[in-house]
Amino acid sequence: MQVRHQSIKSRFRFLTALALVPCLTGCFASPGGESSSGGGPSGPRLRVALAFPPAENFSPYGADATLLSRLGVTEGLTALDANGAAAPALARSWRREDDRTWRFTLREATFQDGTDVTPAAVAAALTHATKARPAPTALAGVTLSAEPDGDSGVRVTTAAPDPVLPMRLAGPSLAILSPKAYGKKGERPGAPTPVGTATGPFEITKVNGGGSATLDRHDDYWGGLAHATGIDARFVKDGTARANAVRTGDVDIAEAIPAAQATTLDKPTLKEAGTTRTTSLQLNTRTGPFKDPALRAAARTAIDSSALVKGVFEGYADPGAGIFGPAVTWAESKRVKPAGRAKAARPGGASITLATYDNRPELPEVAQVVQQQLQKAGFTVKLEVREYSRLESDALAGKFDAFIGARNSLLDTGDPVGVLGSDYTCDGGYNLARLCDKKVDRTVAEAVRTDGTGERQDAAMAAEAAILGTDAVVPLVHQQIIAGVSTKVRGVVLDPYERALVGIGTRR
């Protein structure tokens, strides 16, 4: 680990932080414990197998943002608690000054490069995020500015009222990094490096391409010393290999165990929990056969999701009910029936390319079943399967007619409106369906403006109905988390939002 300056001030932070809220973020590790110069808990390194390698050089502005948060590398001003509400993180408190302005009070904390977390550094980090292109998904449809306010405050102003801004700032893509992350004079505004520049309990010290990463404990972390002295992360896209690694003791924790492999693990090592992740069929509405709403309707009516639940997920999933599934506990009672759907046309042998990725091993199986169902309905279907990092850019560019992916609907902001804006509006940064519909944009914009928890939920469900009414997306199943965990390991975080995996209390 790199040697860093540790001031009396930062030592004081460590001593006082031991009683503070534990971090719920994740990380990677390898064998062999060591003592910490700072004292406190100290245990062996953790060995963790993750399904997805970094696709964008660990940029916090894209898909790699959740890798960083799950590894315990990055944090935002806020976090989400178990109920999905905003909770303190780098900001210990906040208040709303008017409809468009919030003031966040920072706690004393230190970046992994040894510099202090200051209002100026935080404001600069948020400003860099607003300039990233494409925009981070947490900022879909939102314009904001940030400026330091005194010795411990940051004032954030939005162009339009944003009642869920504290939840939005919990998004992994809005992680706070030190000025060093952006290069001299901010020369890397769109591609900051989180290596040694974040604030979490674990610091990336070595990246071995897309194969593995080494993390060491951040001994000056504001929340106290993590039990594990580090993490050795392996990126293992093959789900069977991840399950075998748990079974043989080669890793301590393996995420995304395939349903087909769950029965092969000893029951004490199998951990499962509900998640807000939905697997969906996204149809390209801008080019190709699915530009025709009638053919999109034909695809929707061809799908039998119960066959996927039983045949592919072996009961570890629920049939697709909408963009929001049963883990979003309030959604079902507020769901609105889609209206104005096109009448299904006969496909007549229309030729389509269906793409998916194999980092989640169930997805190719899902794609094969969907391929068969679409072919039975009269489509000619070519299936293309790649590793996610080799697929994402083509999918976003609309090079496929249909795409099957798994998306956590509350991952980016914890706000149900957030995913609707990023995934289904004209300016959305993760719009795989390439949908641009005036009615959808209008209903999502109305939801964005809506204040009050219940009222905002109602508005989100109205927007969901408008989106489903276009048949741009066909919800297939709502997934469960299945993880393999050694019986020697304690404190693994099974987070329904999938932002966290390893916390400061995770140990063996």
Describe each region flagged by the PLM.
Residues 137-182, 206:
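Surface-exposed binding/hinge segments that line
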Residues 286-327, 365, 467-472:
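Periplasmic-binding protein-like
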Residues 389-390, 421-486:
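Extracytoplasmic/peripheral linker and loop segments enriched in polar/acidic and small residues
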Residues 170-224:
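Gly/Pro-rich hinge or "lid" segments in bacterial periplasmic/extracellular proteins
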Residues 218-263:
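Ligand-site clamp/hinge motif
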Residues 49-98, 127, 197:
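N-terminal lobe/hinge region of extracytoplasmic solute-binding protein
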Residues 314-348, 360-362:
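Structural transition elements
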